[in-house]
């Protein structure tokens, strides 16, 4: 049903995956794309405002999508994983984990991101290594406390 599809596309992305992908794609936030365009996830564009990679071949016309603020980069990343056909299996497995009341973790789902980069399975291994070496699975279990506001300022 449409509601089932919508639920699959609105579910969470494990924090460990988001951190690992941002770290890998942006060189831990030090890449030219991150510094000049708030581009943490290396998303390509062919029509929107973007930054041209310096080492691309002449037949490659893509740019790296750039953003005014980091939050917009994260939002575009979430939208990409939650809607693009290349990640449908990622969403299906995540939905199955949710249905079975199992924990949704980065290490369980990284294998479904081989289409994110041209290096495929090697990319999955890189993400798994980043997650494991930096204990990022700890963040998959974290729950943020609600923000308390006083006069519109977070305390």
What kind of feature is each model-predicted range?
Residues 1-20, 24-155:
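Catalytic cores of secreted/periplasmic lytic hydrolases that degrade extracellular macromolecules
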């Amino acid at each position: 049903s449409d509601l089932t599809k919508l639920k699959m596309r609105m579910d969470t992305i494990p924090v460990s995956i988001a951190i690992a992908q941002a770290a890998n794609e942006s060189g831990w936030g030090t890449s030219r794309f991150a510094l000049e365009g708030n581009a943490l996830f290396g998303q390509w564009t062919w029509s929107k405002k973007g930054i041209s990679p310096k080492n691309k071949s002449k037949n490659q016309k893509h740019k790296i999508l750039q953003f005014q603020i980091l939050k917009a980069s994260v939002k575009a990343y979430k939208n990409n994983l939650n809607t693009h056909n290349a990640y449908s299996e990622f969403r299906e497995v995540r939905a199955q984990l949710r249905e079975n009341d199992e924990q949704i973790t980065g290490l369980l789902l990284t294998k479904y991101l081989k289409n994110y980069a041209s290096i495929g399975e090697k990319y999955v291994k890189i993400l798994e290594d980043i997650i494991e070496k930096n204990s990022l699975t700890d963040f998959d279990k974290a729950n943020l406390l609600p923000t308390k506001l006083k006069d519109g300022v977070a305390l």
